[in-house]
């Protein structure tokens, strides 16, 4: 007997009258007076469950079937038939059913068949994948990740796995998690009374990475086109719907590329993955449009067909100053654009995705290439209608003397970045890249308002459960 996913049955990939087996969990059970039970069985392979029609002639009908409740795990064998009812094209006429796991107490089962609040689901994160929404998020997350890998592979990029433990602060902001095996009750001290990290596991201070970019640059300067994709960490005490202490980042780096090159790459990449999710996860996206955000599908369709606008930071500030809109955060040249500024530009002024370029150097990182005006750097943000910034990137500073001067300006010790400086000493090239926060991308695609609900087990200030 062939075991098939529920998706194959519902999507017509199994011939009518063929007997197959599906394995999954009961979503609902209803019984008719005619001695027939209808089980909705899901296995996570698609959004909808398959209906299994079970006749009371089965030998374990009274002992097992009539006691099944939401969450019980079952193996159902049956014949695929065209469904006479609404809601599905095919169903199973069961010939056998095996219960592999019961729910101990249906009355206290945390995932009972009713709508649960998002806040409640975070408290039972180990069970929330069983819900419609989190299951759909998981499938969309998978499809987006696979589409990103596929896009870069087709473009000739190599995936590089950069370290999670580092001694470098990529952003220079100092919001890093320290990694240490020192005894907190008996810390070694230097003669000056400071913690002696020479005695630590790595012989120096070590941290969880905030970005794979610096390491990625080393491989871009040898393989030409690379990308990193993995977890990153920020010890930022932010309890907002847009922040996580642990999240995933995608970061391409391209040798011999300028800012315009990677702006074009970002546009092509986003359109590629949005098109993929619309085509491959139509069932889940239909759910998000019906239950979470009515604009979810239409937003992506508009994005895929839109031409990106491009504007210099200086011109963007002028637009915002003259627009007559009352902003909560004042806007002037030299300030970093807030979410409300970004969304005004994308949603009201340009009515399209926008690439803002050439930001003031004082609000950007040390590694961004200084422009000829000496005041701005070759940095960019991609702003999307409905969310604001979705990508941040830059051309990297390839001139050693300028890089050293920028480090000095920002109080960084060049000795801590000797290996990074070597890239400028041995065959330096112009190169550029960007970073995409994966959870923000998923939130944008699905319309889910909080990034805590698009990652399996969110890590936030004072929360590291599960």
UniProtKB/Swiss-Prot annotation:
Keyword DNA-binding: no
EC number(s) stated in the UniProt entry for this protein: 6.1.1.22
Cellular component terms (Gene Ontology): cytoplasm
Catalytic activities: tRNA(Asn) + L-asparagine + ATP = L-asparaginyl-tRNA(Asn) + AMP + diphosphate + H(+)
Cell location: Cytoplasm
Keywords (A to Z) from UniProt: Aminoacyl-tRNA synthetase, ATP-binding, Cytoplasm, Ligase, Nucleotide-binding, Protein biosynthesis
Domain of life: Bacteria
Gene3D superfamilies documented for this protein: Bira Bifunctional Protein, Domain 2 (3.30.930.10), Nucleic acid-binding proteins (2.40.50.140)
Position of the signal peptide: none
Biological-process GO terms, alphabetical: asparaginyl-tRNA aminoacylation
PROSITE patterns linked to this entry: AA_TRNA_LIGASE_II
GO molecular function annotation: asparagine-tRNA ligase activity; ATP binding; nucleic acid binding
Family statement: Belongs to the class-II aminoacyl-tRNA synthetase family.
NCBIfam families: asnS, PRK03932.1
Record text on subunit structure and interactions: Homodimer.
Protein name: Asparagine--tRNA ligase
The species this protein was found in: Enterobacter sp. (strain 638)
Underlying gene: asnS
